[in-house]
Curated annotation (Swiss-Prot):
Cellular localisation: Cytoplasm
PANTHER family linked: ACETYL-COENZYME A CARBOXYLASE CARBOXYL TRANSFERASE SUBUNIT BETA, CHLOROPLASTIC
Keywords: ATP-binding, Cytoplasm, Fatty acid biosynthesis, Fatty acid metabolism, Lipid biosynthesis, Lipid metabolism, Nucleotide-binding, Transferase
This protein's name: Acetyl-coenzyme A carboxylase carboxyl transferase subunit beta
UniProt organism field: Brucella anthropi (strain ATCC 49188 / DSM 6882 / CCUG 24695 / JCM 21032 / LMG 3331 / NBRC 15819 / NCTC 12168 / Alc 37) (Ochrobactrum anthropi)
């Protein structure tokens, strides 16, 4: 044995040997099949640079991209009874909750963040589709109400990012109760004279579209978002007719007056900051397009 065997060869083998590759190093564009480097995608707020496809993102990433300098504080999630119905399908609901909490690091599907956008203090309530499809249960409902109450307490506008498949079936009527409860919270914010902007992301469906997600002063949709009460497949099976192309897409809903604008995630922060400054009569509105001033004023009224 000599120094070549003991030192050089192992060094070469280590340099040329196979390295462990992180599973999420590359992300596939669902719209084109293109493979995109994860770091490039993250630096572009998880919008595919070539196609403009908006990937789903975690709630904490959403808050980081949205607030000034990525700085914000979160509200502690409210405590609610866990699995009061003792529900079980393929597995116990309480075990399913534990799995999602371990996987996501979240207590439930909603995160409330406090921070500023373009210097304006706001409350942001973000729904995370990665937690049981963003479904609305007692925990999520209580967190949404908490966000509205905090906005009223601090006299701040509230921006809500919706992403949900609807009510959480494992909680039955307790889940459905959150629809009127969150609706009341919206009305409390409006009675306080505070702006409420909703950003509809992909997907926003089910009971959330029958409550807080469609009660904003202004509704903004991300490009390509699916928005509706029932999914297109369910509707087609019910009416036994083929739906129009693009039905329930963000652009389709804007064309038919259901949302006010479709805005790229890359432009959301600046757009919302301009709108809120108009709605709260803050300085620095002179660069806002005239049609945005008119729409925002009409909505606020």
């Amino acid at each position: 044995m000599n120094w070549i065997t003991n030192y050089v060869r192992p060094k070469i083998n280590s340099m040329l040997g196979r390295r462990e590759m992180p599973e999420n190093l590359w992300i596939k564009d669902p719209s084109t099949g293109e493979m995109v480097f994860h770091k490039d995608l993250e630096s572009n707020q998880f919008v595919i640079p070539s196609s403009g496809h908006h990937m789903r993102i975690k709630a904490k990433d959403r808050l980081r991209f949205f607030f000034d300098n990525g700085e914000y504080t979160t509200l502690e999630a409210p405590k609610v009874p866990v699995d009061p119905l003792k529900f079980r399908d393929e597995k116990k609901y309480i075990d399913r909750l534990k799995d999602y909490r371990t996987r996501t690091g979240m207590d439930d599907a909603i995160v409330n963040g406090l921070g500023t956008i373009d210097g304006l203090p706001i409350v942001a309530t973000v729904q995370d589709f990665g937690f049981m499809g963003g479904s609305l249960g007692m925990g999520a409902g209580e967190a949404i109400i908490q966000g509205f109450e905090k906005a009223i307490e601090l006299k701040r506008p509230l921006v809500l990012f919706a992403a949900s498949g609807g009510a959480r079936m494992q909680e039955g009527i307790l889940s459905l109760m959150q629809l009127p409860r969150t609706t009341v919270a919206v009305e409390m914010l409006k009675e306080a004279g505070l702006p409420y902007i909703v950003v509809l992301t992909n997907p926003t469906t089910g009971g959330v579209t029958a409550s807080y997600a469609m009660l904003g002063d202004i509704h903004i949709a991300e490009p390509g978002a699916l928005i509706g009460f029932a999914g297109p497949r369910v509707i087609e099976q019910t009416i036994r007719e083929k739906l129009p192309e693009g039905f329930q897409s963000a652009d389709y809903l804007m064309e038919h007056g259901m949302v006010d604008m479709v805005v790229s995630r890359l432009e959301l922060k600046d757009t919302i900051a301009r709108l809120l400054k108009i709605m709260t009569r803050q300085p620095g509105n002179s660069d806002a397009p005239e049609h945005e001033k008119t729409e925002a004023t009409d909505k606020a009224a």
